[in-house]
Amino acid sequence: MDYKQIVTAALSDALAGQLTRDEIASKLERPKTSDKGDMAFPTFTLAKLLHQAPQQIAQDLAEKLDKTSFEKVEVVGPYLNFFFDKGAYSAETLQTVLTAGADYGQNDDGQGGNVPIDMSSPNIAKPMSMGHLRSTVIGNSIAEILTKNGYHPIKDNHLGDWGTQFGKLITAYKLWGNEADVKADPINKLVEYYVRFHKEDVDKPELDDTAREWFRKLENGDEEAHELWQWFRDASLQEFNDVYEKLGVTFDTFNGEAFYNDKLEEVVQILKDKNLLVESQGAQVVDLSKYNLNPALILKSDGASLYITRDIATALYRDRTYHPAKNLYVVGSEQTYYFKQLKAVLQEMGVPSADDLEHIPFGLITVDGKKLSTRSGRIILLAKVLDDSVKLAAEEINEKNPDLANKDEVAQQVGVGAIVFGDLKNERTNNIDFVLADQLKFEGETGPYVQYSHARAESILRKAGKVTITTDGNQISDPEAWDTIKTLADFPAMVKMACDEFEPSVIAKYAIRLAKTFNKYYAHSKILTEDAELPARLALVKAVSTVLKESLRLLGVQAPDEM
């Protein structure tokens, strides 16, 4: 029973076509308190159209409305406040949730369309820092949300395993490296060399020339350069996979930049065939002036390829392999201009899926307000943050519930979940200043708070034993239950909104809202009292548990049954 559609239809009939149904639906509001109804329609925008005072319009509409679907409709100033039939609405909502289970909110809007998601994409020979968290968890959550909306996401970890940085790294290793040191501690040593290179090249510009020469050798298949590159790549991947395992994130492909090296010639040839390449100071560029963009540099004057050259090859490969319905790049906001250029080049080339390319930008993670940087050596390792979070979660759980049977497993779920949820509750374009202790609080808008709310619901159900659950909403008389039921009914709309906006925070904020309404209900109601309403109250608790768990799953967070 979609009351938004019912309200929209009733108003549409009363307005006799003066507003479209979409216009009406967009104006509907959820009152902040239940005494003002369950849905409200403001009449301000109709005042100019009808040349009447909003209060008079509200009165006239109230008289014309078919009110049979509502408990009552009240006029309060310029607002029409709709009160739903609580019994019917509650029964249908609970029945829908409990029948569907984890599939509640599922839709087939995507019709199975493929959606490659370029995500995570760390650079080889650099550790995964907190700066890599956002693309990884945002991309993973978007993939889950897309699946819930009927799409087929392909999670593509487009590793940064090629580029001029490898010339710098090989140069640094040849100058200052030691094989035994690297084998003993690969990533930390490689980072040490990389940071040293950038410190020393300030006074020694010839280092950049050497680095460029080593990268040219790598591109030309030089045996020593390739062996060093492969070694750096293998060592890095092992560390990356350890972090992904902690996060519970998997990928469908790890096709890094190097995978596309043999596809670059075709890119250049297509650009030439379409007369898109023009020479500029010895380099080859694509003129994008008609898009009000700077030229896209495709080949340097020495013939070396650039990042965009490989990204064009990647987009062509994905287009031919997946025939995507959407083509997503979960990359930081600082790359917005670059993705405008990439999309424009693909459109000029006539790539079929070019129009469906969407950059999904996100803000920075800072610590003490400062940006993280591998070059400057300002790195906070993601693996260490996750381990520290699990350790703090274990201490908190041991204090709150020392007899918990599976404390280590729950600490892992809570500690990692706190970091993931702490990121995803923020609108993705916002910057985040990271404070670990804030993420781990069991009260407030945190992952542990939502997880604890789910565990509380599961605890109630265990204590209830084998009581038969009923979805007869007429039997729930608690006023706090009504807010919880309305929140449960919102979930399918939140799933759609999160998909339309590629915004996991929609789900995270919804989970917080549901947890809050449930905990308010829990505080005001004696749920396990053995009376006629017990089966209906348990149905509500079961529905809350189901939807909280599914909300957390969409975010890539686990929901422990006990905490």
From Swiss-Prot:
GO biological process: arginyl-tRNA aminoacylation
Record's keyword annotation contains Transferase: no
Record field: catalytic activity: tRNA(Arg) + L-arginine + ATP = L-arginyl-tRNA(Arg) + AMP + diphosphate
The EC number(s) this enzyme carries: 6.1.1.19
Motif 'HIGH' region mapped to chain: 122-132
Domain of life of the source: Bacteria
InterPro entries: Arg-tRNA-ligase, Arg-tRNA-synth_N, Arg-tRNA-synth_N_sf, ArgRS_core, DALR_anticod-bd, Rossmann-like_a/b/a_fold, tRNAsynth_Ia_anticodon-bd
UniProt cross-references to NCBIfam families, sorted A to Z: argS
Similarity comment: Belongs to the class-I aminoacyl-tRNA synthetase family.
PANTHER family: ARGININE--TRNA LIGASE, CYTOPLASMIC, ARGINYL-TRNA SYNTHETASE
Protein name, per record: Arginine--tRNA ligase
Organism name: Levilactobacillus brevis (strain ATCC 367 / BCRC 12310 / CIP 105137 / JCM 1170 / LMG 11437 / NCIMB 947 / NCTC 947)
